[in-house]
A protein has these predicted regions:
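A polyanion-binding, active-site-adjacent surface
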Residues: 2-223
């Protein structure tokens, strides 16, 4: 007697959570920011004070993307206002770029952290958390359509340009992409702050400024 075929499990796979479920129908930066306040696309919202959405000029030609908000950003609700943000401001100014003319944001909109004593210490988001949050960043890019997209650090670069992208070997290079007319990757300013000596910090800061001067050159048509 022939065996009866074993019935396949037809139970549908559970839907993967993501920010896509929270995107507004009509998308502007204002409507995206408002919708993101209630995002529960991953569990990071549980430990964060608030959503930290992008900020800056709505007609900005340059969009800078980091990894995630830090402790100060989480408390204040604004991106790049902590020590790394202050260093970024200095680098932008030295490169001939005005932060007020840019738009700054992060791949992940909630602060991921672990407690050490009384402090909340940054913890890198994992691949699933990045995937879940990316719809916000893609929507920001779609609305703003920047001329130059600057990826600050490996998390931003690999989230947008692919997991094989290496900032160490491709930083400062001008790339073409569907994301923006030009894409330039460089280090995240927080990596400079982690350098052990003042000489190392100064050297890495000058390298960041050099990368940002490439961006300034693109805006002026010099590159």
């Amino acid at each position: 007697m022939a065996r009866k075929p074993i019935a396949a499990d037809t139970k549908p796979a559970p839907e993967r959570r993501s920010a896509a479920q929270f995107l507004p129908d009509v998308q502007t930066i204002a409507s995206l920011k408002e919708a993101a306040r209630g995002c529960e696309g991953c569990d990071l919202y549980l430990g964060a004070t608030q959503t930290v959405f992008g900020a800056g000029k709505r007609t900005a030609r340059v969009m800078l993307v980091g990894e995630q908000p830090g402790n100060e950003e989480d408390l204040k609700g604004k991106p790049f206002v902590g020590p790394a943000g202050k260093l970024l401001d200095r680098a932008l100014e030295d490169a001939g770029l005005d932060r007020d003319e840019t738009y700054v944001t992060n791949v992940v909109k909630h602060f991921k952290w672990e407690k050490r004593g009384k402090n909340r210490i940054h913890k890198k988001p994992n691949a699933e958390e990045i995937r879940a949050c990316l719809p916000w960043l893609h929507a920001e890019l779609q609305v703003l359509r920047p001329q130059v997209l600057v990826c600050l650090g490996a998390t931003a670069a690999q989230a947008l340009l692919g997991r094989d992208f290496r900032v160490t070997t491709q930083r400062g290079k001008v790339l073409r992409s569907e994301l923006a007319e030009y894409v330039v990757a460089t280090v995240h300013p927080s990596s400079i702050l982690r350098q052990q000596t003042s000489e190392d910090r100064e050297r890495e800061l000058h390298a960041l400024i050099a990368d940002l001067r490439v961006v300034a050159g693109l805006l002026s048509g010099d590159s």
